[in-house]
């Protein structure tokens, strides 16, 4: 029967421990969407759309070049709905309040409170109601504030789109600005630099269009999009050059495109649906505190019936025995645990908020401290998500100012839209050099970029009788129109030997994760008229410019600090292995053997788990790869954090014990995260880890103190009940003692923590807690029994007529020893000398001890059935407490050496 009750309680724990602060919007096929990767049907549909020509796309989606009219829009919207992404829906406040209340201890305390009320023990019922109420409200208020702050961050990059629509009955059309939720499949939209892609699109016209897809793919550099595919056999929709996906951003250029999918039917929508519908399993904090809770509840369920049976059998008054057993049950239940946990977490959240960190879920604070593996995306998380000019070299790989200045003139004088590479080149030259170059060279003409040539040229003149054509573009395209190279200052033919040297240098740059662009030139006699493509011939290859998305300045020190704190960092990125390895090298992370997404497709969970343990860098991963790796690392017993900012990171953010999103993250990433960093500095990660460990240490102090003290008290009660002709303490005394002790614990969230307790990840360990109870609980029982002997033999309180004196004597010893244990157990060091508690805790425990001594002498003594103690009692009290502290310190030293100290 006991096992059945235990199983039921365990089930209750798993269901009711702190839950996320949201409820899910139901979607069609939600279970299949949440449980699988992007459906094959969606991939097939995207590939089919990519393969269509413009007329086929118009027919397939019911649109036409002049735009849809109002009737057509409503008809299509009736089928596909608004262009809105399925999202998590905030709970009503009353549901949130219920979720904050329904943890096992609150439910258990409520039952005990109702029993106390039914037996007219209003004092106990009131105390219990107060504890439950404070805990619930603290949790409710703090999480509501955090959620409100997180909601305030949700702002789309652009909430309108430029759409061609029929505007009157005459069939006239115009470009109009509409909220993106009003788009429907078949709409014709116009794109320009800076626009967010408002839906899934098929490009039908494009000019110099580059789109940043890092939020979906992890690819740090923008990709080109065109109207006619250059790779019709492409089987990955995200790499199709005629498709654009919702949530990505136009970096440069212009385009017109047809809407092919909206809302939940988009690629973004499918990922969002997966995240919204996936019911997250309990995280490490919830599981850990659940196991500890079960240990304490089991202990209470075993000891309370024993106390009832012994007292009922020896005293003969079963009703009195039942009331006493109920008081013992209340005393054994750590009713302050929910409040201590919540207030400690809330204090951690407040401290982190001063570091501009939003903590959406309070239990994420402790998970921060328990985290032993941090998986992180690369682009925009570790890196700046900004392209910079890294190298400018001649063909031998030596730094060349000539190449830099030629590239600058090309980027400066071109009149087309300047892409990110042009911006990086322009920023790579200081202002003085830029003024000198622009003053020295005048523009003559240009040959614009196009996708067939994949290069662009400008013609400049320093002297009136000579023009210089400067061309930059993709390496192979420049080689195709070059016949010579500048080598060690000389012009030499581009032969096979030189070509091998060029390949060797550029391959080395590529292996460093750099994107290489070639620069070439030639001198021409001055002439009138325009320059044409045919003039891009017989060029001299000057060298290369190479680009990189560099790490944030704080990345390397942050990762170093995390490593020093015992946290293993793993990179999970959708970018190429070469680029990712370069970033790892830049931030001081040993990448080792790189694993790419295609390598893990056919691995079993056990094989991948083994691989994940020893691998630092994973590249070319899909969102589902990231989620799977995080889940398997958790299965191996690790507490896993994931840090990311893109759409492709959302499933992994949800799967992790602690999801961390960074500044500038997309909405879906913020929504899936537990913690949001508002500062670009990643050093706040280390602050969060330390705060999490400090929070855990303070929570564990309360649990250890309460568990060991309660174990000792119950053991003492059992001994006294077996041999005394009266109750060793009245139920009222137990409740008052428990209340006063609990009051002294209110300051624990403000306590100091020893340095050694925050040097490595901390985890819940019920076995260690049980062992701790067995070691330290009986110490208090030894001195309780000495107190029994003192009161019985020295003060002759050994008859029912003198039981009040006996109970008063034990009440004071029990309260003071219980309160002193706070200072003994809060540190492995010598208390008050090597480690001192924070002043709020010293003040609170001092006040409670003073009140405990004064209570038997106060006017309330008669009401509380206590009596004044003789002065001769107090030297004995000092001796008992001193002995208790000395023995506890000795046992603590042995325990710490043998088992360690959390």
Where does each model-flagged region fall?
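Alpha-helical transmembrane segments of multi-pass membrane proteins
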Residues: 99-118, 132, 136, 158-159, ...
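Hydrophobic alpha-helical transmembrane segments
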Residues: 119, 127-158, 165, 281-376, ...
